[in-house]
Curated annotation (Swiss-Prot):
Listed PANTHER family: SOX TRANSCRIPTION FACTOR, TRANSCRIPTION FACTOR SOX-12
Keyword match DNA-binding: yes
PROSITE patterns reported in the protein's UniProt record: HMG_BOX_2
Transmembrane segments: none
InterPro entries: HMG_box_dom (IPR009071), HMG_box_dom_sf (IPR036910), SRY-related_HMG-box_TF-like (IPR050140)
Organism of this sequence: Tarentola mauritanica
GO (cellular component) term, any one: nucleus
Protein name: SRY-related protein MG43
Pfam families tied to this protein: HMG_box
Entry GO MF terms: DNA-binding transcription activator activity, RNA polymerase II-specific; RNA polymerase II cis-regulatory region sequence-specific DNA binding
Keywords: DNA-binding, Nucleus
Length: 72
């Protein structure tokens, strides 16, 4: 069972697609670096919808898998 997505992952899912559409040959490592820098530049107020969605996903995950324990 995968862990629920955090706010960055929720945001980056759509942003990654946009970058891949513009630069299909860009390596995944470079895309990830760009996404990380862009996320850090966002204001806290811009992150709120993604934080809320991540919270919703976390609650759903807890309901779906009540005995879940993260084991790396």
């Amino acid at each position: 069972v995968k862990r629920p997505m955090n706010a960055f992952m929720v945001w980056s899912q759509n942003e990654r697609r946009k970058i891949m559409d513009q630069w299909p040959d860009m390596h995944n490592a470079e895309i990830s670096e760009r996404l990380g820098r862009r996320w850090q530049l966002l204001q806290d107020s811009e992150k709120i919808p993604f934080v809320k969605e991540a919270g919703r996903l976390r609650l759903k995950h807890m309901a779906d898998y009540p005995d879940y324990k993260y084991r790396p």
